[in-house]
């Protein structure tokens, strides 16, 4: 059984079907952050928190004919939940159509243990066109479920941005509701 979430945004609701079977750790992380069941570290205070992570955050990066990106607690693209985890790349899941939900990351990094690891945390993006150059680099863990939700993604993608791809007017996530 796959998990369904409704992302309530400033432009309307986006229903997303998550790929529990293909990306179980990523789905568990996203759902845990959305509900507050997963502990995260506030980047401003350093305090551990267990409240819904995504509530009130923004889509801090919007690139027309590419994607909308959110999930940064600082609103800059540099913040996260205070931890990271590895990719769950499934070769059968490809960026060959729009409206896919995937983890944003900073690529592979060498950790303190000397091993290479992934840099997934809380940031995600929803594609608005096929993006095959991303295959194998980002964990795909869901898909926008219906035409009404796709229209909301399209509205968000159309928000005016500055030269750094930051929205010139707020484009926000009100909350993420897990409906299972």
Language-model-detected regions and their locations in the chain:
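Cyclophilin-like peptidyl-prolyl cis-trans isomerases
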Residues: 1-180
